[in-house]
Curated annotation (Swiss-Prot):
Binding site for phosphoenolpyruvate: K22, N23
Residues with 2-(S-cysteinyl)pyruvic acid O-phosphothioketal modification: C115
One GO CC annotation: cytoplasm
Keyword Transferase recorded: yes
NCBIfam families in UniProt: murA, PRK09369.1
Species per Swiss-Prot/TrEMBL record: Wigglesworthia glossinidia brevipalpis
Protein name: UDP-N-acetylglucosamine 1-carboxyvinyltransferase
Enzyme class: transferase
Annotated active site: C115
UniProt lineage: Bacteria, Pseudomonadati, Pseudomonadota, Gammaproteobacteria, Enterobacterales
Amino acid sequence: MNQFVIKGSNKLTGDVFISGSKNASLPILFATILSEEEIEIQNVPKIKDTDFAIKLLRYLGATVEENKSIYINAKNISIYHAPCNLVKTMRASIWALGPLLARFGEGSISLPGGCEIGNRPVDLHLYGLKKLGAKIYLKDGYVKANVKGRLHSARIVMNKISVGATLTIMSAATLAIGITIIENAAREPEIIDTANFLISLGAKINGVGTNTIFIKGVKKLKGGVYKILPDRIETGTFLVAAAISRGKITCYDTNPNTLNIVLKKLHESGARIEIGKDWIKLDMIDKRPKAVKIETSPYPGFPTDMQAQFTVLNLISYGSSIITENIFENRFMHISELIKMGGRAIIKNNNIFCYGVNQLFGAQVIAKDLRTAASLIIAGCIADGITTVDCLYHIDRGYCQIENKLKNIGANIKRLKK
């Protein structure tokens, strides 16, 4: 098992180059199953989750070559079953089911794993596939789906906004007969990116980025070349890291348009923000942040994936604040670890009451999920003393070379084997 050892009290200053989006790469990689032709995917982040996705594609029978780009040819897929040993660590594997079903008429996926953040059921994914004509069976820990002939169009009204289910239904509907309508669809940039990828292969999709998406099914998709959008959560994480360290940072190869609410909250905290077409500059030199009120909600609201990082900001800010988590009911696993570091916070229902302190202190902490890991690492960078962060598996799932990027802006961080 690996751990980070971080010597804190460092001002983080410099340049960071942002990787491709984890949350767009995964559905796009699995959507390559829909095509029989070679596809080149650019800007795929080198992280554990994309490694697992590529491993699963190869298991199914796809040819995958890895260089600066990922080259995938799913023509010869002959296995439609994703076993437990391949998908148990990655919840995103459910996104393979829709493409398998749409192209081959069948598919089965072991109920997936990943971060244990509350109750993340796949019910909405399966509801959508049933509406498209699939028969669904749950047996021995597996989701099994089949359809006679092709999937057919449907009007699908989501009773809850779901990024994952929107992606599943949209991908499957690209090869369905007729026009499928998804109402109350999620609007996240990663959904837009996945739709743009599918459109580049010949899919007919309209309304993406709104709450109603229209998909006119086609018989087949072609090959192509596509570049993944930048990771907005990685960008936000480094911006917060600089802000809490009273530093100055420029993030390159990013997209400011996907971070409007995050940049607004950083500005409220006292940061000076400048933006360009593909860069963001934050200046918090020698300024202590002000506490900001946070309430997570679906895009374009404040992203739940930035909640833990802003918790750290509020814990070292002037004043007190409330963070309300509206997406996941158990996304507070960072709180007990931050309290070990001297943070003052109380959880009541879905709220975190944060009380700013002058200084966090080094401690031995455990990264219990991906964004907890990120929050503890950036907290360690500013804490007085030595912080050790255990269970790096989670951070490696979602952040590409995070320790090297932090070192480049002044962090004293080492990866050690226990």
